[in-house]
């Protein structure tokens, strides 16, 4: 019996794969407006500071393909096909949807490599994919909207924090800062759950890791006239030091799932500059990347959606 094909649309932000690609990437983020030479060189300088280019492209591809392999191992009666769709670099989300259509995929599951729902992120990604799929007559896309409280995701970070605390002598003098990418404040007024979801993630991880000293912060805010959600992690570090005299700061950028510019520069460089100024210790646990525990977490999330689809088909077939 021929296996039914299921498209697995894995979506992410995207990143330039070489310094020569930075200008086109930056221009796409700015909706087609080229950045100033000063802004462009500033961004290129950040990439050079982390070794020349971000490892994100390689990690994202590895995450997508390993997740697809896991799904094929879990659901042997189906054939999952991997399609990578990126927001700001090729292959774009639309490229992936068109490829699924050409391949004869009639049904797909989409997952965004970001745990917290926002109109700026997960909603926007899924809307782009579904809008085009409806325009071209398929495939039918079943989106996963959020997974910020997935137990295996919580366990991953709790384990990382526990391991980090083994390196800290005075645990009462240490604090964990859970962070995500800042977004414009206007999303809060519109009822976006992004902030509440980050807080919930932090609370769940803190409980699982049995820590009391923790808070949430925001990082990597855009340079626009609109106010962005705060406090920024660097300002927060200084405030926490002034108030509590913490001697160790543990940064957990749980809004991200891989090492990339925002982690390797904004955390590992900029936040460390602050902790060095304060004569405090800097720690940043390992990111999930394509570790087997995290791939298993993603597979669990996708399998829940797949089981919903299978159950729905059984109901339809029995009626």
From Swiss-Prot:
GO terms for cellular component: cytoplasm. InterPro entries: Ferrochelatase, Ferrochelatase_AS, Ferrochelatase_C, Ferrochelatase_N. Its main location: cytoplasm. It catalyses: Fe-coproporphyrin III + 2 H(+) = coproporphyrin III + Fe(2+). It is an enzyme of class 4 (lyase). Keywords: Cytoplasm, Heme biosynthesis, Iron, Lyase, Metal-binding, Porphyrin biosynthesis. GO terms for biological process: heme biosynthetic process. Pathway: Porphyrin-containing compound metabolism; protoheme biosynthesis. Pfam families: Ferrochelatase. One of its GO terms (molecular function) is metal ion binding. Its EC number is 4.99.1.9. It comes from the Bacteria. Fe(2+) binds at residues 181, 262. It is found in: Cytoplasm. Fe-coproporphyrin III binds at residues 13, 30, 46-47, 54, 125. Coiled coil: none annotated. Belongs to the ferrochelatase family. Involved in coproporphyrin-dependent heme b biosynthesis. Catalyzes the insertion of ferrous iron into coproporphyrin III to form Fe-coproporphyrin III. PANTHER family: FERROCHELATASE, FERROCHELATASE, MITOCHONDRIAL. NCBIfam families: hemH, PRK12435.1. This is Coproporphyrin III ferrochelatase 2. The lineage of its organism: Bacteria, Bacillati, Bacillota, Bacilli, Bacillales.
């Amino acid at each position: 019996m021929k296996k039914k094909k299921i498209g697995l649309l894995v979506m992410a932000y995207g990143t330039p794969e070489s310094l020569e690609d930075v200008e086109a990437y930056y221009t796409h983020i700015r909706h087609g407006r080229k950045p100033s030479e000063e802004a462009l060189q500033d961004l290129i300088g950040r990439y050079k500071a982390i070794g020349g280019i971000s490892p994100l492209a390689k990690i994202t591809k590895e995450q997508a393909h390993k997740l697809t392999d896991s799904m094929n191992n879990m659901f042997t009666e189906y054939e999952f096909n991997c399609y990578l769709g990126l927001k700001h670099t090729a292959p774009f989300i639309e490229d992936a949807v068109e490829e699924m259509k050409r391949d004869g995929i009639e049904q797909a599951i989409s997952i965004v490599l970001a745990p917290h729902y926002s109109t700026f992120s997960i909603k926007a990604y899924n809307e782009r994919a579904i809008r085009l799929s409806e325009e071209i007559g398929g495939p039918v896309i079943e989106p996963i909207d959020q997974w910020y409280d997935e137990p295996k995701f919580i366990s991953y970070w709790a384990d990382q924090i526990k391991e980090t605390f083994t390196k800290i002598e005075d645990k009462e003098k240490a604090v964990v800062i859970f962070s995500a990418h800042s977004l414009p404040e206007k999303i809060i007024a519109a009822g976006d759950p992004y902030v509440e979801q980050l807080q919930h993630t932090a609370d769940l991880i803190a409980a699982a890791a049995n820590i009391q000293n923790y808070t949430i912060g925001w990082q990597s805010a855009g340079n626009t006239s609109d106010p962005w959600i705060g406090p920024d992690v660097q300002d927060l570090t200084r405030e926490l030091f002034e108030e509590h005299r913490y001697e160790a700061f543990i940064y957990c950028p749980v809004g991200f799932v891989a090492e990339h510019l925002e982690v390797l520069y904004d955390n590992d460089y900029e936040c460390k500059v602050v902790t060095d100024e304060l004569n405090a210790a800097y720690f940043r646990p390992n990111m999930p990347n394509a570790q087997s525990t995290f791939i298993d977490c993603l597979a669990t999330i996708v399998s829940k959606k797949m089981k919903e689809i299978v159950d729905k088909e059984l109901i339809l077939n029995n009626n």
